[in-house]
Amino acid sequence: MKLRSAALDLLAGKHASLLAFDCEFWHKGQAFLPREVGGYHLTRTGDAWTRSAPFFVVLPPPAGQLNRVSSKFSTTTPATAEVLDILEETERSAPEFLGDRDIVDVYFADSKVKPYLKPTSWLKGFAKLIGESVVVVKGDMDLKAIKSACAAHGFTFKTPLGIVDIAAHNPEFTKRCKTAKLEGTYDCIKKELDAGLKKAFPIGKAHDPVSDAAMAIQIAAWLVQKDVK
């Protein structure tokens, strides 16, 4: 998909690669590691941007991963979400009754998850793309998680060419919207967002990484064209 956008030009500066992405996480002790990764990659040629098809991948758990995957932060069918909720509550209250119902196995078997499973080696190429791009994120956890996973597997991680972190504007969002949460902020300002970018980056449910990345890049584009203070 090709598009022209002065806001995207401003976000990228002199660079020709924009990457908006979001993660949901595996939790291992105090560490956060990427579980679901989704978003969009844009490349500039002349005065036009080419937007990739949205990407979405699911990565394997780290060794020793606890069997807990929250439905709230997972891209699954409603039926699997219900099973995850039951298993999560069982694990919390009566783990002796779990038997063979491993939460991670249930999650991986879901029809919205299984087709997108990738080996850990996928991170190597994604880390390379990060190092060649200006990235758009909400908060620093996503980049930290990718960096930690790369370190754990011996992959090279280079700092992005630039970082547009919309969380830097959380005080302004809270003042205007009474919330700094991504979905709440988006709903608050969506009437002011660029119509072309809304079409290019459609919104689904919150905590779907592709949808969250779409909200983040639209908000980032709005920020560079607005005095939000």
Language model segments and positions:
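A short, structured active-site edge motif that brings together acidic residues
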Residues: 57-60, 159-173
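Short, glycine/acidic-enriched loop or turn micro-motifs at the edges of active sites
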Residues: 23-27, 168, 215
